[in-house]
Amino acid sequence: MKKIGIALTLVLWGLEVTHAQNGGQLKQAQVSTARQTPQQITDQYLASQKSLTQRKVALSQALEHELAQGQNTNASNVYNITCVQLVPILTAMRVNDEQLLGFLQSMNPNQSNNGVKASLRENQALESKTLNNCKQLKSLL
């Protein structure tokens, strides 16, 4: 295992979406990894991604439920679910992938890390598409 000379701090985005009257609040948690093994860092990343994925699925289900209302769909609710709550989670997932990829490449520059790269591309595309949808939705409100 390759040693890194300087202490590495990897920012894993642990998100807590608190449902308050203002529609939600996003908190970012930093995790210092200076005294952790590469496996512990990777495990933290995976746990964070799992939590974010669960939140993404829950919000996607809420969005599907809202859209199933047909003509009774509330555009404001769709905007709140998609643009206020879901976009920050998608951004956090992308940042997690970027941070993990950087960490893994610093540990072993010759490793391909194709799985992380594929996840990063997928999360970038989903975030971009969702942001574009939010711009269109906002113009309708």
Regions found by a protein language model. Name each.
Residues 4-13:
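Sec-dependent N-terminal signal peptides
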Residues 9-10, 62-63, 124:
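Enrichment for repetitive, rod-forming helical segments
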Residues 14, 130-132:
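A generic structural signal for ordered secondary structure
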Residues 15-20:
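Sec/Tat signal peptide C-region and signal peptidase I cleavage site
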Residues 21-78, 135-141:
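Immediate post-signal-peptide N-terminus of mature secreted/exported proteins
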Residues 76-130:
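Long, amphipathic, charge-rich alpha-helical segments that form helical bundles/coiled-coils
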